[in-house]
From Swiss-Prot:
Organism: Shewanella frigidimarina (strain NCIMB 400)
Cofactors: Mn(2+)
Binding residues for substrate: H124, R154, D155, R186, R192, R262, A263, D264, R265, K335
Gene name, Swiss-Prot/TrEMBL: gpmI
Enzyme class: isomerase
Record's protein name: 2,3-bisphosphoglycerate-independent phosphoglycerate mutase
Keyword RNA-binding among UniProt keywords: no
Length: 513
């Protein structure tokens, strides 16, 4: 087999750029490798947020959006934008899957349960979408409407859920029907790393009202959680009862509508409700329900979808397949879906010639406890893959900046950045030995802003800052004004290949030779 000259793309998750050095873990980290690369090779800053990635203007980027834009080589208009537009255009209340779920529950004298991340963060969901669903259910005649609120504190300030919970109490009062039936932190309900002990707590809360606590109102439950020193993300399972002390549990003939639009943290809990042979934990109750996913969460989940995804053709992965090129996707479990499913435009199956390596993320409660995560093991596998000269293209995601940045722990985020920098050194060295090249970038910012100057709280969300773009290869100039969708066309050009017409991005590297 002929040896390959690999082109590697290293995605440093959550690694943005900011002139503000205060509470900036990226700035304060000791990163001799990246410092040297920036001094020796062409580099620039590119956009990974807002309208440049198909989000509303000013909206921070996120990992799903970033990887879809990088992998598809075009601006992909995101579900947040698409669903918000449907609501504004009054198309949402006519959505066939949503209407059918509400109507079936009403006809069977059942309840309409609505679950999702109650957040204005706009990363996994938006509370405006949840409000529209509550309104639509009542307007179609549902009198039993129950909200199961997953609390954020990760893409929003750590203690910011109160206004949302109060607003929904007021909303239900104005509608004359419905109430909040439970609250729980996203740490439990939205796990994506097969920690079924967490997900089971959310499942039992919704199906049995089995929580650690019971309260008469959601704001009261939140206040008690704060008194226990639980931020929104970690709020323990709390059932909310009505004036008669009755809980609302998911029962036969009810409908359950999941209002998250992002797939990766929606899959696990969805499977607990819809997979008859689910075995992640023992389910005490398995009610026969009508379940609706807001968007496609996974190809193997058999449930109606309110907003099916549009097909993206000639993504980078598909183009490499058509060119008979070999490719490797590698990351830890936390970002594995991003370098595979999302990078491939929502396609689960690997392309011909595409290999995948999954490294288990550490089993710790939060990643500030192990800021290096599994970066050493990941880099061991990556270096071996480079040395094998088996691959034309390698896509790797280092999750540390994002996953540790979300903890709000500045010192840990600094250590995370330093760990990644050391790994990059090993990768660049391995590539040099096989005459390979490397692009280094990020999908969005996070670790460069670890404190919110407006309130002094830890800043755990993403940012809309520009992200780095470094080319470790031939003598070249990088054009200004780049964005994530320019990366795939640039990679194909570096490989001497033409850019598919479906890719609206442009090559932003001019080779001097």
């Amino acid at each position: 087999m002929a040896k390959k000259r690999p082109l590697a793309l290293l995605i440093l998750d959550g690694w943005g750029y900011s002139e503000d050095t205060q509470d900036n873990a990226v700035f304060h980290a000791n990163t001799p490798v990246l410092d040297k690369l920036n001094a020796q090779y062409p580099h620039s800053l590119i956009s990974g947020s807002g309208i440049d990635v198909g989000l509303p203007d000013g909206q921070m980027g996120n990992s799903e959006v970033g990887h879809i834009n990088i992998g598809s080589g075009r601006i992909v208009y995101q579900e947040l934008t698409r669903i918000s537009k449907a609501i504004a255009d009054h198309e949402f209340e006519q959505n066939a899957a949503l209407c059918d779920a509400v109507d079936k529950a009403i006809a069977a004298n059942g309840a309409v349960h609505i679950m999702g991340l109650l957040s204005a963060g706009g990363v996994h969901s938006h509370e405006e979408h949840i409000e529209a669903m509550c309104r639509m259910a009542v307007e179609r005649g549902a009198t039993k409407v129950y909200l199961h609120a997953f609390l954020d504190g990760r893409d929003t300030p750590p203690r910011s859920a109160k206004n949302s919970l109060v607003h929904f109490d007021e909303l239900f009062a104005s509608l004359g029907h419905g109430r909040t039936a439970s609250i729980i932190g996203r740490y439990f309900a939205m796990d994506r790393d097969n920690r079924w002990d967490r997900v089971s707590q959310a499942y039992e809360l919704i199906t049995e009202a089995k929580g650690k606590f019971t309260y008469a109102s959601a704001p009261e439950a939140l206040e008690a959680a704060y008194a226990r020193d639980e931020n929104d993300e970690f709020v323990a399972a709390s059932a909310i009862v009505d004036a008669q002390g009755e809980a609302a549990v998911l029962s036969d003939n009810d409908s359950l509508i999941f209002m998250n639009f992002r797939a990766d943290r929606a899959r696990q809990i969805t499977r607990t409700f819809v997979n008859p042979d689910f075995d992640g934990f023992k389910r005490n109750k398995t009610p026969k329900i009508n379940f609706v996913m807001l968007t496609d969460y996974a190809a193997d989940i058999n449930a109606p979808v309110a907003y099916p995804s549009s097909d993206l053709v000639n993504t980078l992965g598909e183009t490499l397949q058509n060119l008979d090129k070999t490719q490797l996707r590698i990351s830890e479990t936390e970002k594995y879906a991003h370098v595979t499913f999302f990078f491939n435009g929502g396609k689960e199956e690997p392309f011909e010639g595409e290999d995948r390596i999954l490294i288990q993320s550490p089993k710790v409660a939060t990643y500030d406890l192990q800021p290096e995560m599994s970066s050493t093991e990941l880099t061991d596998k990556l270096v071996a893959a480079i040395e094998s000269t088996k691959y034309d293209v390698i896509i790797c995601n280092y999750p540390n900046g994002d996953m540790v940045g979300h903890s709000g722990n500045f010192d840990a985020a600094v250590k995370a950045c330093e760990a990644v920098d050391a790994c990059i050194g090993r990768v660049v060295e391995a590539l040099a030995k096989v005459d390979g090249e490397c692009l280094i970038t990020a999908d969005h910012g996070n670790a460069e802003k670890m404190k919110d100057p407006s309130n002094g709280q830890a800043f755990t969300a993403h940012t809309s800052n520009l992200v780095p773009f470094v080319y470790v290869g031939r003598d070249a100039v990088i054009k200004d004004g780049g964005r994530l969708s320019d990366i795939a066309p640039t990679m194909l050009t570096l490989m001497g290949q033409s850019i598919p017409k479906e890719m609206s991005g442009r090559c932003i590297i001019d080779l001097k030779e």
